[in-house]
Every structure is written in C-alpha cells, then in structure tokens.
Swiss-Prot record:
Cited InterPro entries: Kinase-like_dom_sf, NEK_Ser/Thr_kinase_NIMA, Prot_kinase_dom, Ser/Thr_kinase_AS
Stated name of the protein: G2-specific protein kinase fin1
Active-site residue list: D151
GO annotation terms (biological process): cell division; chromosome segregation; negative regulation of septation initiation signaling; nuclear envelope organization; positive regulation of G2/M transition of mitotic cell cycle
Keywords, comma-separated and alphabetical: ATP-binding, Cell cycle, Cell division, Cytoplasm, Cytoskeleton, Kinase, Mitosis, Nucleotide-binding, Serine/threonine-protein kinase, Transferase
Molecular functions per Gene Ontology: ATP binding; protein serine kinase activity; protein serine/threonine kinase activity; protein serine/threonine/tyrosine kinase activity
Record's function text: Promotes chromosome condensation and nuclear envelope dynamics during mitosis. Activity appears at metaphase-anaphase transition.
Source species of the chain: Schizosaccharomyces pombe (strain 972 / ATCC 24843)
Gene name in the database record: fin1
Amino acid sequence: MEKYKILECIGHGSFGRIYKVQRLKDGALLAQKEIHFGNITRQEKQYIADEVNILRNLKHPNIVQYCGEELNRSAQVINLYMEYCGHGDLANLIQRYKEEKKRFTEQEVLKFFTQLLLALYRCHYGENAPACDSQWPREIFHPKQSVLHRDIKPANIFLDENNSVKLGDFGLSKLLDNTRVFTQSYVGTPYYMSPEIIRSSPYSAKSDVWALGCVIFEICMLTHPFEGRSYLELQRNICQGNLSCWDHHYSDDVFLLIRHCLEVNSDLRPTTYQLLRSPILSDIRSKLESERVVLEQSDLLHKKHQMLIQLENDLQFREQRLSARESELENVIASRLAQREEILRRELEKQLRDMDARYQRHMQTVVNSMQKMRVTSPVDHNEQPESSTAEMFVDCTIEASQSPLLHIPKLGISKPLQTLSCPGFTLTTQQPILKRPTLRKELSSRALHTTATLMKYRANASSLRTTPIDKDGQITSLQQKNGTSNQVADCMNKLLHTSLDGKKLSPSELCNKFSDGEGLPNRKVSKLSVESDETAVSASSGESVPTDSTLTDTKSKSVFVHPPSPQSLYVEKLEKLNIRSDEVSKPSKASKTLHGYALPSLASPYDVHAEEKIARENEMDGNFKTMKINQHPDEYVLRTPKKIQLLEGQKRSPVKQLGRLGYNKLRRSAMDNAGLELRKAASTSNYTSLQSRTLPGSWRDDEEEIPRPFLRKMLDARMMRA
C-alpha cells in the first residue's frame, strides 16, 4: 500500500531527482530525494548511509527535518523523505534578486546569518544553543559528537513558507567523534573552500564558518567573495583574503562579522559559539526567538486546526460510509422482503390453484352425482316424478269413511319411508350400509321385482283373501289388540273384503275391477313397500278385531278364515331382507308396471313383542303348508301385461337378482314352504288332492282356482330364485 503521493518534480540532486510528495495519512507535504544506488561506488553508498544516520539525529528548527526513508531493492532505489521548504533554496532567491537588481535588507541579512549560526552550533556542539538571556557555558566544553557539513553553499540552504532558513543536504557531511577532531578529506565547491583546505591542512569546524562567511557576503553583494580567471588565481585570492568588491550599502557591523568569518588564519577565526555571543546578533536572536515562539504556537494551532479538519473529514467520511451502509442494508432488506413476498405470493397462488382445482373436482363430482341422483317433485299426480324407488314417499293420510267402499291411500313423495313391521320376526331399525352404485342397482332390481310380482298376483282373484271376523261379524286385526294401527293392513283389509262385506262382489268381479284400475290413484311409483296382512285393521264399518286364536282355532269360528295372500307373503320376504333405504337413485324402466299402478303401503310405527312375533311366525309356518287353489284357465296370460311376461323371460331377471341377495332367508320363509307344497302338487298333477288339503279356516267354496300355466310359471320363478 502506498504511503505517499508524488505531486511534482522540484529539482535535481547529486544522486537523483527531488519530488514534492504528500503523505497520505495526514496530508503533510514532504520532499522525496530519490537516490539510485545500483551504479554507484562503495564510497558513494557510504556517503548515503552517513547522511541518513546524521539526519536521524539532527533535530533543529533551522535544519531540514528528516521524516524517514523507503528502500526498494528490486528497483535499487532509496527514497529519503525530508521536510518540504516551499520557498526553495537560497541560490534561487539570490539569482532572482540579482536579475531584479534588488538587495536584501540588513535585517534580512542578519536574520539569515543568525539562523545559520544556530544550525551550525547544533551540528558542531551536538546540542541547541543556549537562550540569549541565559548563562552561556565555557567554550572549552567539547560535545560528545560533532557534525561537519563540508558543503555549505546557497544551494543547500532552504527557505520555508515563513522565510525561515533551513540547512540541508548533508550528503558530504562527516560525522566526527571526540578522538577524531579533524578530517583529512574534503569534497566541496571551490568558491566556498577555506584556505586551510587549499593548503591541505586538516578540515575543522572553522572551515564551515569560512563557508558561512562566503554565503553571507554573497547575500549582501549578490556575487561570490573571491573571483579568479583560473582555478589557481581563485586559490591565490582565497589564501590572500582578497575580496572581490564591497560597498557601504550595509553597516560596518555587518562588514566586520563577514570579515571575521573570512579570516585567513584559522586560529584567529571565531567559532559559532563566539559569533552568537556578539551584541549585534543577540538582538536579532531575541527577535527570532520571539518570532519562533509565535510561529510554534501558530504551527500548533494550525496543526490542531488541521487535525480537527482531518477529524471532521474522517467523521464525514464515516458518516457517508454509514449512510451508504444503511442504504445498502435497506436495499438488501427490501430485496429480501421482496423475495420473501414473492415466495409467499407464489405459495399462496399455488395453494389457491390447488384449492380451486380441488373445488372444481369436488364440484364436478357433486354435479355428476346430482345429475345422477337429481330428484324433482312432480307438478301434479299425472306427471312422472324423477325419483328412484328409494326416494319414494308415502302419504300417510287415509280418508276415513263409514262407507264399506274401498279407499286406497295416495302415493306421493312428501314423507320418507318408515320402518316396516311384519309379524313373525323382528326387524332392526338400522339401515344397511350400501355403496351408491350397488344400492341404486339393487334397489332398482328389487323395485322391479316387487312391482312385477304384485302386478302378476293382482290379476288373479284367488290372491285376494279375507281376514278373520269375530263373533259380532266384524273384521279384526291383531295389532288393534295391542293398541296400534296399521294403515297398510287396513287398506289391504278393505281391498280384500269389499266384495264380501261391502258390495258383495265375487272374486272375479273384484279382480276385474282391480285390474281396470278402479279406486287407485293415477300415479306412477317405482318402489312398493308393503306390510304383512297380519297387522290389518278393521274396515270403516267398525267391526271388532279377533284375537290370535282366530287364526289357529278353526273349530271355534263359524266363518271362513282365509290364509295370507301372496302379496303379504312377498312383503314378508322383503321385510326379512330388510330392504329399507333413503338413498337416491334414478327410476328404472323396470319399475313401471301395468297402467303405472302398484299397491300402496305404509309403515307401522310400532312393533309387537318378540315373543308374539315368534309365535305368529310358527303358526304361519304350520298353517300355510297347504293351500286351496282355484283354477282359472289362462287368466294369467290374458290379464298379465306383455312387459311383465318379457321380464320373467329375461336371462338375468329381477327375481334372480333378488334371489342372489337373500337366498338363505327366502328359503326359510313361509312363502317358500307354501311354494314347495304347490310345486309338489303340480308335479303330481293331483289337483283334486291339492284342493282337498286346506289350511285351518279353509278356503271359500266359491273361490276360483289358479290357472295351471300361471301356477307353473310362479313355481318355476320360485325355483329359479332358490
């Protein structure tokens, strides 16, 4: 790292150039003396070393201050840094005055002379001269070290900004100790050479005084004191003391001082100690000391001011660096915040996109599900509702009437299906958990089978059975005894006994009327849920309800008690399969029956006790082993719609699908037992024996027989399902 900055070249020395430089750490101006030692002799190198050693130890206000050296071995250059004197050397000043034909004042001459004496005193005696008002030591005092300049001339005397004299360029100076008072060698300028040097006498401190006298004479007269056409003539004039010229422009005191310094006899020549004690120089010295104190104070203040300025500059520089650092930190923080905000924004956008994608997928799923499961309420009863069998609801309102006419409840979608209560077994209220596609397919198949089967049996008058009546001739119901009411059983009771108790119609007439759709609401449904006829209620005529013994004891009653109809047996199977669900599915085409009608059903909110159910189931299993079948030739083919006939001939019929789901339960049902008896009777073709085998409370005498084709198709369907 560079410590100095070169400003300009200010001169040439004995061994190189002299530059004006600036010290970077404090801005002080210095003079850099460049000395190349690569091509110089050993003696010249010793001169350089001596000068460096001398300058390190010489510190005086009138001596050029040594500031340091810098060695560059690669370039073989040594740089000496000394105090910079802004007004140049004394030789240039004399030349300028000579050109301008100006003369120095006597005070200026005495001032230069006194300052040079003080500098030589420091070199000769090794210490500063005592103050002018103090006690001077004796002249016999010998300093420990003495320095002989040996090259005092105007070119080696410098002036600073205050025109103070600075003695410099100690390149030819010789360091003497106490044992070596004189030196035999001399190298200097001939115009300032002392007589003893010309006579080859030893060189002493008084030789520097001779050179000082020559310099003061040149300052006064602006010319050399000794002149000659040749070197010999110059030497002769120096040895004789013949001065070139002298005018009376200055006082005699000045001339006497110069004359004493140019004494040819060195023994009579005064020393610096004697010259400083002269009265004429004492006054000048006092003034110089006063000026020096003022200058020192001024320099001190100036240095302090410069120091303050430097501190202010440093503080300002640090403030600028701090401000730049703050702005840089702010930019870094802002950039990092911006990056963080960008990252958070991207993450938030990604989350929003993910949420939107999930929402879109969810909405698409919901839309697809709603498109598959959408249910819209019909405007009127003539409009087909867009609902599946599981979405069908039943209106629980039944018109109460005292008339024995048949009143069938209307089907609607206002209320959900309730839990069915069937006699002979206990049903749980927990709904089976099925997946949506499986449930939709299963419910559609079950609804198709339910509707097709009921429509098939509805065409036969032999499927209509009556219920027991009590002693007073009124129709009774088991559940009325338990304090409950079943509207589906009431409707079935009314439907089955209208011909006998109401309008006295025959089974054939009732079948025809029922097939024509009389008394049924003009509404299409997709699923039928009915209940066992064991829970039938009395008709609107207000007949009483018989007890359970009416079903089993045939001898105690005089009226005929018919076995359960195929509708009730089929309902019992559905109940054992626990087919109940509120899930939504689209209506299937197979759910549309003949004329769009199906028997309505309502769910009973109450169940009988478990023991009574088991007892009834056992009784039903024992009582329905034989049936009386009335034959009606080709009634099934004539009255059954073509759609039902086709459905029964399908490869995968609803009956087969329903049989897959509940095979074990169906085999244990009463209908399977009755179906097996019918199958055996059909295989033996013993219709008379089948007719003679009647259940307790036998069939009615005027009841028509089931046609053989219808019976065979029914049994084939049961066997296929099993």
